[in-house]
Design a protein with these regions (language model features):
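Terminal substrate-recognition subdomain of acyl/acetyltransferases
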Residues: 1-31, 41, 68-72, 76-78, ...
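Basic, gly/Ser/Thr/Pro-rich low-complexity segments located predominantly at protein N termini
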Residues: 31, 35, 60-62, 86
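A conserved beta-turn-beta hairpin within the catalytic core of GNAT-like acetyltransferases
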Residues: 36-44
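Residue-level recognition of conserved beta-strand positions in structured domain cores
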Residues: 24, 46-47
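A short, internal acetyl-CoA/4′-phosphopantetheine-binding micro-motif in the GNAT/acyltransferase core
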Residues: 47-54
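Conserved acetyl-CoA-binding loop-helix of GNAT-fold acetyltransferases
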Residues: 55-66
């Protein structure tokens, strides 16, 4: 993939799969996964982008889309994923939408 193609990659919400996806020519090349919790929170627990797509800011684009959508729905963000935590640390505009991680959040995250 060259830098020009990065603009052609789309981001979509796969509600059934409980994830936001980076899509290149119909193929999922990255995702950030979440679990709904308590009716008003989303626990983001894992983000991945294929290695060949790395270094182009795509993970940041993906996470920004997911967090913006979550906030627009009036839900709070629970950051278990290290990438999402790091992103939030650099973007204080999300601060009011972030809920602190509690033990019950960790227990709700899928294993494996």
């Amino acid at each position: 993939m060259d830098p020009v193609n990065a603009a052609e990659i789309t981001v979509r919400h796969n509600a059934e799969g409980r994830r936001y996806e980076l899509v290149d020519a119909g193929r999922v090349v990255g995702a950030t996964h979440y679990v709904p919790f308590g009716g008003d929170e989303r626990i983001f627990y894992h983000t991945t982008v294929e290695e060949s797509y790395g270094g182009r800011g795509l993970a940041a684009r993906l996470v920004a889309f997911a967090l913006d959508d979550t906030r627009a729905l009036g839900q709070r963000i629970v950051a278990v994923c290290p990438y999402v935590r790091a992103y939030l640390a650099k973007h204080p505009e999300y601060r009011e939408s972030v809920a602190p991680t509690r033990p019950e959040h960790l227990a709700a995250v899928p294993r494996g």
